[in-house]
């Protein structure tokens, strides 16, 4: 399934995903050339056919973007099967992405947390600017991977759109903490 809109990541998202030493050192990672540039900080809008355009503004939208593709299926499978059984699926995926991939034995030698971090790092690179990082961190309860919440724990939740609260009718449907007065506009 593929639904696409013209969107750009927020400044915070873009700055946290710009090419770093880890990304630059990955030999054969074709996504580096396709997604990042070391010359400037233009935002990238990706399209299903592999083309892209630079965003005209850093404004971002709340329009949902749902993408499902084979690379995501490999990573979901590797994560679901766990380190013992998922190593082969992860190696298969990585061989399609890199000229060199870690061996199955090397992946199995990782601790469970290191294995999960490896998959989360792959998902971060694979789904750059697609809005999946936050859900991955929340789903795996790995908030330490965020730079900082600066004590703003309400950022762990999304605001509930006012339309949804209104549709609840007589049922009390409180807004999530930290979003008092949020209307969704």
Positions of PLM-derived features:
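Basic, alpha-helical nucleic-acid-contacting "clamp/cap" segments
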Residues: 16
């Amino acid at each position: 399934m593929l639904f696409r809109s013209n969107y750009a990541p927020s400044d915070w998202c873009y700055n946290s995903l710009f090419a770093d030493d880890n990304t630059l050192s990955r030999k054969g990672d074709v996504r580096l050339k396709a997604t990042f540039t070391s010359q400037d900080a233009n935002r990238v809008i990706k399209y299903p056919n592999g083309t892209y355009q630079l965003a005209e503004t850093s404004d971002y939208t709340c329009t949902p973007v749902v993408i499902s593709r084979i690379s995501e299926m490999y990573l979901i499978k590797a994560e679901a099967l766990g380190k013992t059984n998922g190593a082969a699926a992860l190696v298969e995926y990585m061989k399609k992405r890199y000229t060199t991939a870690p061996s199955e034995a090397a992946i199995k030698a990782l601790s469970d947390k290191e294995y999960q971090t490896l998959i989360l790092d792959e998902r971060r690179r694979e789904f750059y600017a697609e809005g999946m990082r936050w859900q991955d961190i929340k789903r795996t309860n790995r908030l330490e991977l965020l730079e900082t919440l600066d004590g703003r724990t309400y950022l762990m939740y999304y605001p509930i759109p006012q339309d949804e609260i209104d549709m609840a009718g007589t049922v009390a449907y409180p807004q999530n903490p930290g979003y008092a007065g949020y209307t969704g506009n």
